[in-house]
Amino acid sequence: MESGFTSKDAYLSHFNPQDYLEKYYNFGAKHSAEDQILRHLLKILFKIFCLDGVKGDLLIDIGSGPTIYQLLSACESFKEIIATDYTDQNLQELEKWLKKEPGAFDWSPVVTYVCELEGNRVKGTEKEEKLRRAVKRVLKCDVTQSWPLGAVPLPPADCLLSTLCLHAACPDLPTYRTALGNLRSLLKPGGFLVLVDALKSSYYMIGEQRFSSLCLGQEAVEAAVREAGYTIEHFEVISQSYSSTMANNEGLFSLVGRKLSPCV
């Protein structure tokens, strides 16, 4: 791939969703840093969506990638979910799981873990079907555009969720701030913003392919979120980092904010 920050075209050409899933989401297969991080993220998302009152009618997941782990607790608190991504291959991988097609990634170990977190109220198969029913649409998304979902008519969302996306989509802080502002147009006043992303990372690996990452610190993230028109209700740092062969991050963070209402 070209030098410099990984371009959008490079993602279309070089991002392999099957390799990504196998490297980062092969849950329970080994006691790896990736396994521990996924456990942390599932616990955080369970707390946000099942304990902390982040709920509503519509959640839009920005940059879903080929993954569904981030939606397993969210589907308990939102009636409808829209999944989005920039790359066609990730959208196809999502559709494969939603439609139970042959070769779809096996999320059942992750689903079982989330069911345990939620008190085993339902079996894993029931949880999977609930999420499939909740995901109403899978759409193309580009956070660098003023209208990230294009001209698709949608009601304003009660919550925007974005996990491990913006650090890879934004080459610099001005673009990051602009992306947060662009996303704001999708959210109703008072609606929730939930971000999970890597801290102090400049790259991540999928096999031999190296992808750029925007080096984000807590202060920079908080400043960008506020400048884009959100309040911050909660910020948590996860000290666990990925394996040194996978990425060079220094932990991750989760943030819950809300879109400021317009001044009267």
Swiss-Prot record:
PANTHER family per record: NICOTINAMIDE N-METHYLTRANSFERASE, NNMT/PNMT/TEMT FAMILY MEMBER
Gene3D superfamilies: Vaccinia Virus protein VP39
Post-translational modification: Deiminated by PADI1 and PADI2.
InterPro entries reported for this sequence: NNMT/PNMT/TEMT_CS, NNMT_TEMT_trans, SAM-dep_methyltransferase, SAM-dependent_MTases_sf
One CC-aspect GO term: cytosol
Keyword S-adenosyl-L-methionine: yes
Main EC class the enzyme belongs to: transferase
Name of the molecule in the record: Nicotinamide N-methyltransferase
Source lineage: Eukaryota, Metazoa, Chordata, Craniata, Vertebrata
GO biological process terms, semicolon-separated: methylation; nicotinamide metabolic process; positive regulation of gluconeogenesis; positive regulation of protein deacetylation
Lineage: superkingdom: Eukaryota
Family label: Belongs to the class I-like SAM-binding methyltransferase superfamily. NNMT/PNMT/TEMT family.
EC number: 2.1.1.1
Quaternary state and interactors: Monomer.
Entry keyword set: Citrullination, Cytoplasm, Methyltransferase, S-adenosyl-L-methionine, Transferase
GO molecular function: nicotinamide N-methyltransferase activity
